[in-house]
C-alpha cells in the first residue's frame, strides 16, 4: 500500500520532470544561434530548444497547454523560427540543430493542438503554411504519400511506422 505522502512525492517529482524540457535557448540579451548557425537578435519571444517531439507530442505538449499555457506560444514561435531557418518544422531539435532522428514531424500535431485550443500569441496562417510545407516535403518518405497515398516498404525503411505517423 502506498501512502498519500509517497503518492504526492511521486506525482510532484513526475510533474517536475515533465517541465525540465523544452529549454530556453537564448542569451540574456535574447540573441540566439539558429538552426542555420546564424546569430539572431531578439525575436520578440523566448526561444526554446530540446524539442524531443516524438516523445512529448502525445502527452507533455497537451499538458503544457493546460497547466503552462503562457509558454506554448513561445514554443510554437520557436518552431516557426526553426522552420524559417531550415525549411521544415523541427523533428528533434537539440541546442541549435535538428537531429532528424525520429520518423514523422510531430511539431505538426503540437501546433495543430494549440490552434484547436484557440491559443494566442502566434500567427495561425504562418503556422498553417509551415505545417503544409513541412508535410508536403520529401522528408523520410512523404513524397510517396503525396504520389501514391502510401509508403512502399521496398522503397523506404520503417514504411508502416512512417505511414502511421503521417496519417
What are these regions (language model features)?
Residues 71, 78, 82-167:
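Active-site cavity-forming subdomains of large catalytic enzyme subunits
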Residues 1-47, 81, 88-91, 120-125, ...:
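Acidic/polar, glycine-enriched structural segments that form the non-catalytic walls/loops
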Residues 2, 46, 63-67, 95-97:
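Hydrophobic alpha-helical bundle architecture
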Residues 43-45, 56, 60, 108, ...:
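Flexible glycine/proline-enriched surface loops and loop-helix/loop-strand junctions
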Residues 47-51, 98-101:
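A short, ordered amphipathic alpha-helix with a cationic face
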Residues 13-27, 49-72, 112-118:
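Alpha-helical support elements that line or immediately flank enzyme active sites
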Amino acid at each position: 500500500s502506498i501512502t498519500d505522502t509517497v503518492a504526492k512525492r511521486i506525482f510532484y517529482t513526475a510533474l517536475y520532470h515533465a517541465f525540465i524540457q523544452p529549454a530556453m535557448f537564448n542569451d540574456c540579451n535574447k540573441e540566439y544561434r539558429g538552426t542555420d548557425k546564424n546569430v539572431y537578435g531578439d525575436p520578440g519571444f523566448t526561444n526554446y530548444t530540446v524539442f524531443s517531439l516524438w516523445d512529448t507530442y502525445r502527452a507533455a505538449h497537451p499538458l503544457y497547454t493546460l497547466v503552462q499555457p503562457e509558454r506554448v506560444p513561445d514554443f510554437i514561435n520557436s518552431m516557426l523560427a526553426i522552420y524559417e531557418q531550415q525549411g521544415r518544422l523541427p523533428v528533434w531539435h537539440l541546442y541549435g540543430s535538428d537531429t532528424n532522428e525520429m520518423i514523422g514531424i510531430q511539431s505538426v500535431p503540437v501546433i495543430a493542438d494549440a490552434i484547436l485550443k484557440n491559443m494566442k500569441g502566434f500567427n495561425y496562417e504562418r503556422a498553417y503554411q509551415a505545417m503544409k510545407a513541412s508535410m508536403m516535403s520529401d522528408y523520410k518518405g512523404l513524397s510517396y504519400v503525396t504520389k501514391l497515398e502510401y509508403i512502399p516498404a521496398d522503397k523506404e525503411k520503417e514504411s508502416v511506422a512512417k505511414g502511421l505517423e503521417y496519417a
